[in-house]
């Protein structure tokens, strides 16, 4: 059949049915007349319905029923298991190692939801009151309360204020299918869709499942969704501990979650049917007062929660101890308040268990007067100050360059560097002359530290720091220069604490743990047990630090503890990091925006916090000195020319001396002083090239050593030759009698 033929047949069909429709009123009228006459004559026996009319009526009924069924069809609803599985709290929670809630973080901002509350975790009185208030025949009907529906219809016809007829099942269906509860969805069709959805829900869910879902999905106040969030936010309770009055007030919120306290009190009174309802007015005002917050977590570790809590509903158990966390917060807050006039606004505290590496306290800041309260002070990179010196001296002792009794000259020194002349000074701008390494480290003297760095080498020391967990040192040693000994590099408090912990563990380093499920990595050795032990003993010596800090500073504790302070340039940062046999504690005080403090050093800023935390940690079991490892000998020593008082000192076996007069030979090993590594020298175009020379200078005992320039032997190092090198990059090496390179520099001539 052609397309035209099909179209013609369709038109003929349409005309026939159009005529039948047009004739229908007259035919129907005639039929009704005949039926009426038959009824008058014979009653029901005389009524005869023509088959065609009967078919039409049945057709109309079927079409109408199908249309009704279609337009009132409910949306597809998930089953109970799917709703439970798809439930995501708006929060994530942080717990300490003992299961105590220490913080939470808001992840989802659409609503405030807690974890799904099981029906058995809601107090029985609260369950009964919610049913009585919202659907008192809930246990009896099959999804639609016909009595309530009839009453609501009668009230509407009589012009009365309509009562609610939506059952719990209908409300749950509306929560699961939001289009059932759209604004304006109050027509007959919408109500019928809700009814059919409720029937479908009742056919697949149990009554307890429907009630449980309602208690979790219902909105109570503001953005609080579910009885868990409402109980915690409005009463500070769990659903299991809700009393009768609590439940009455919560049920009074359900019809209008934003109702004023007076309206809530009146509705609670009506639900209670008590004669004396005066208590509800005050309870409602207190419950809904502006001071009530929906976030009642302790808020003990906001910076750590911001870092760890990224997934809604997450429950992370940290290594923290809530009691130690509180003690650290209290100590830091008290100190910052005391420094109010010194422009010190920020601080951070880390406490670590030495053996496990578990972080027991993590305080990234306390807010207060901070201008950057969201910034984590424990993870921020700041200048280290003098806190890197212990690792420098440990390296010197380990390599045999010096001992704890070696004499270092604390006197003015000028060092040529690629960026100019470097002149280190002490904190108090004074110099003490010859001092032992013990006094120099414990007293945090700067010039002796720089002289020690000359022994170890900048690159080697930078590499040692990197191995000890200081991951912010991404440049080579030449970038930091001699100031690396004095803490020009930037470090974090977490890195500091972990590095000092390695000294407490005899030179073994491993990453710290923040969560209980984190893997424990095997430690690696960064220095020898002997060097670590000797440095720890130097840091724990109150007599050695007395010349700089006094005999009764904040660093002195009634038990054994090794400690070091540090202050960065212009007093922008100060540190105090130390350890006992069981704990390592680190404190940073400063300003996260980088502006300087006013006359605040490590001993006056960070040290009091460190002391308070250490006293709290060691109250029951005071810190004890670690046992001396093998390979260390103790000797009675005396110093020449009365440099220091006689004392007993510790040495690596084979390095001990009875009388200390000069630094050991290793401390005077030769170094290339000029040219300076990394320097760029330019030829003067106005001076004949043959007349331009570059002087070489070597310090220390260089007898028998030779200089090698780009594999060319320049002769013995004591000749101080002048060289003319062509433009380009050059390598100058100093080698000993065995041909071993003891020092080298790279420089450029243009």
Give the ranges of each region predicted by the language model.
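N-terminal type II signal-anchor transmembrane helix
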Residues: 2-95, 280
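Conserved catalytic neighborhood of penicillin-recognizing serine enzymes
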Residues: 155-182, 355, 402-461, 505, ...
């Amino acid at each position: 059949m052609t397309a035209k033929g099909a179209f013609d047949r369709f038109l003929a069909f349409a005309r026939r049915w159009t005529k039948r429709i047009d004739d229908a009123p007259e035919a129907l009228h005639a039929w009704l007349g005949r039926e009426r006459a038959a009824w008058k004559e014979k009653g029901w026996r005389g009524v005869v319905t023509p088959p065609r009319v009967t078919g039409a009526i049945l057709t109309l009924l079927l079409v109408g029923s199908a249309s009704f069924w279609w337009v009132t069809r409910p949306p597809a609803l998930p089953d109970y298991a799917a709703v439970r599985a798809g439930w995501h709290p708006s929060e994530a929670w942080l717990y300490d190692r003992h299961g105590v809630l220490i913080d939470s973080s808001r992840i989802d901002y659409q609503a405030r939801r807690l974890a799904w509350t099981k029906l058995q975790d809601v107090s029985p009185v609260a369950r009964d009151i919610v049913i009585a208030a919202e659907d008192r025949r809930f246990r009896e009907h099959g999804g639609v309360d016909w009595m309530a529906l009839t009453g609501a219809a009668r009230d509407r016809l009589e012009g009365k204020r309509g009562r609610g007829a939506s059952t719990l099942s209908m409300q749950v269906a509306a929560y699961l299918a939001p289009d059932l509860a759209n604004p304006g969805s109050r027509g007959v069709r919408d109500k019928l869709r809700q009814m059919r959805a409720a029937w479908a829900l009742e056919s697949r869910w149990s009554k307890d499942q429907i009630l449980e879902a309602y208690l979790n999905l219902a909105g109570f106040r503001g953005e609080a969704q579910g009885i868990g969030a409402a109980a915690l936010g409005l009463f500070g309770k769990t659903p299991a501990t809700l009393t009768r009055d609590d439940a009455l007030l919560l049920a009074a919120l359900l019809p209008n979650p934003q109702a004023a306290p007076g309206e809530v009190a009146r509705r609670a009174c009506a639900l209670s049917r008590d004669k004396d309802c005066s208590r509800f007015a005050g309870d409602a005002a207190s419950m809904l007062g502006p001071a009530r917050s929906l976030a009642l977590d302790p808020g003990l570790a906001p910076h750590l929660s911001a870092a760890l809590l990224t997934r809604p509903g997450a429950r992370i158990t940290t290594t923290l101890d809530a009691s130690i966390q509180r003690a650290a917060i209290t100590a830091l807050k008290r100190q910052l308040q005391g420094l109010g006039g010194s422009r010190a606004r920020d601080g951070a505290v880390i406490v670590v268990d030495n053996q496990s590496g578990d972080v027991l306290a993590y305080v990234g800041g306390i807010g207060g007067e901070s201008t950057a309260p969201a910034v984590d002070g424990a993870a921020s990179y700041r200048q280290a100050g003098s806190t890197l010196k212990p690792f420098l001296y440990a390296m010197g002792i380990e390599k045999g360059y010096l001992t704890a009794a070696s004499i270092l000259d604390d006197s003015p020194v000028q060092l040529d560097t690629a960026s100019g002349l470097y002149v280190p000074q002490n904190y108090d701008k004074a110099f003490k002359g010859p001092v032992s390494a013990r006094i120099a480290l414990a007293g945090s003297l700067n010039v002796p530290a720089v002289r020690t760095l000359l022994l170890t080498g900048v690159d080697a020391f930078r590499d040692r720091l990197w191995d000890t967990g200081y991951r912010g040192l991404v440049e080579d040693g030449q970038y930091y220069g001699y100031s690396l000994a004095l803490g020009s590099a930037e470090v974090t408090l977490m890195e500091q604490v972990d590095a000092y912990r390695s000294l407490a563990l005899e030179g073994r380093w491993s990453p710290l743990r923040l969560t209980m499920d984190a893997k424990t990595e095997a430690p690696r050795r960064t220095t020898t047990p002997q060097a670590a032990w000797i440095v720890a003993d130097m840091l724990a010596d109150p007599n050695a630090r007395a010349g700089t800090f006094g005999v009764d500073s904040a660093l002195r504790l009634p038990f054994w503890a090794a400690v070091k302070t540090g202050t960065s340039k212009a007093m922008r940062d100060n540190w105090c990091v130390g350890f006992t046999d069981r704990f390592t504690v680190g404190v940073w005080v400063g300003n996260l925006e980088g502006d300087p403090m006013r006359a605040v050093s490590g001993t006056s800023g960070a040290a009091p916090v460190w002391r308070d935390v250490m006293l709290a940690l060691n109250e029951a079991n005071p810190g004890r000195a670690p046992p001396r490892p093998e390979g260390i000998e103790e000797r009675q020593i005396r110093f020449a020319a009365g440099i220091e008082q006689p004392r007993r000192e510790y040495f690596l076996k084979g390095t001990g001396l009875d009388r200390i007069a000069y630094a050991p030979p290793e401390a005077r090993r030769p170094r290339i002083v000029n040219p300076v590594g990394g320097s760029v020298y330019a030829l003067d175009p106005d001076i004949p090239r043959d007349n331009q020379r570059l002087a070489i200078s070597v310090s220390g005992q260089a007898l028998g050593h030779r200089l090698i320039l780009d594999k060319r032997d320049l002769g013995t190092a004591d000749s101080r030759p002048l060289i003319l090198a062509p433009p380009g990059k050059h390598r100058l090496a100093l080698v000993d009698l065995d041909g071993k390179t003891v020092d080298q520099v790279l420089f450029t001539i243009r």
